[in-house]
Amino acid sequence: MTTLADLRINYSRASLDEADAAPDPFAQFDRWFKEALAAKLPEPNTMTLATVGADGRPSARIVLIKGVDERGFVFFTNYESRKGHDLAVHPQAALLFYWIELERQVRIEGRIEKTSAEESDRYFASRPLGSRIGAWASEQSAVIDSRATLEAREKAVSERYGDNPPRPPHWGGYRLVPDSIEFWQGRPSRLHDRLLYTRDAAASPGWTISRLSP
């Protein structure tokens, strides 16, 4: 059996100090995301989305972030998927960005709301044709009997809508409105830097910053 105890990296690329951190977590996220882009990391927009179902079971999966502004973090999916059902009963979620090459993580927690129909329509129209057809063909998270069934549905949707499939009513966006955002920078000897931004209406610019023990 593979031995895992000796698999370790001593992080030493950078530090994260309160004096250097932006007072607003969205500005800090933008700074780190731009650095991930500049480092040419593969798909720096990938994140883990964690949800909880009606039975209390947690579930996590990788999704793509498609928008960030002062309102929150936006992603799109099938509302009838497992995550969609989870978010319908528990509209709270957590996101995790992990940029191992930069020895960084960003952890985000908050409430979930659906984006407007206009936002969902606009993003759906920007997707490649195959992805728009796939949104109709796939009953995401449902059991199917074979790959052939999925491909038959894809063909039927393509024949029905041609080059202009509309957005399915079961497909659209969610926005996570954060109440906390943690920035983690790996440091030597596991004494990592962790800065936690917590929403605070009484603070300026609406967030307090705390250092967490690693």
UniProtKB/Swiss-Prot annotation:
Its EC number is 1.4.3.5. Its cofactor is FMN. Pfam families: PNP_phzG_C, PNPOx_N. It comes from the Bacteria. GO terms for biological process: pyridoxine biosynthetic process. InterPro entries: Pyridox_Oxase, Pyridox_Oxase_CS, Pyridox_Oxase_N, Pyridoxamine_oxidase_dimer_C, Split_barrel_FMN-bd. One of its GO terms (molecular function) is pyridoxamine phosphate oxidase activity. FMN binds at residues 61-66, 76-77, 82-83, 105, 140-141, 184, 194. Gene3D superfamilies: Electron Transport, Fmn-binding Protein, Chain A. Keywords: Flavoprotein, FMN, Oxidoreductase, Pyridoxine biosynthesis. Substrate binds at residues 8-11, 66, 123, 127, 131, 190-192. Pathway: Cofactor metabolism; pyridoxal 5'-phosphate salvage; pyridoxal 5'-phosphate from pyridoxamine 5'-phosphate: step 1/1; Cofactor metabolism; pyridoxal 5'-phosphate salvage; pyridoxal 5'-phosphate from pyridoxine 5'-phosphate: step 1/1. It catalyses: pyridoxamine 5'-phosphate + O2 + H2O = pyridoxal 5'-phosphate + H2O2 + NH4(+); pyridoxine 5'-phosphate + O2 = pyridoxal 5'-phosphate + H2O2. HAMAP family: PdxH. Homodimer. PANTHER family: PYRIDOXINE-5'-PHOSPHATE OXIDASE, PYRIDOXINE-5-PHOSPHATE OXIDASE. Catalyzes the oxidation of either pyridoxine 5'-phosphate (PNP) or pyridoxamine 5'-phosphate (PMP) into pyridoxal 5'-phosphate (PLP). This is Pyridoxine/pyridoxamine 5'-phosphate oxidase. It comes from Burkholderia cenocepacia (strain ATCC BAA-245 / DSM 16553 / LMG 16656 / NCTC 13227 / J2315 / CF5610) (Burkholderia cepacia (strain J2315)).
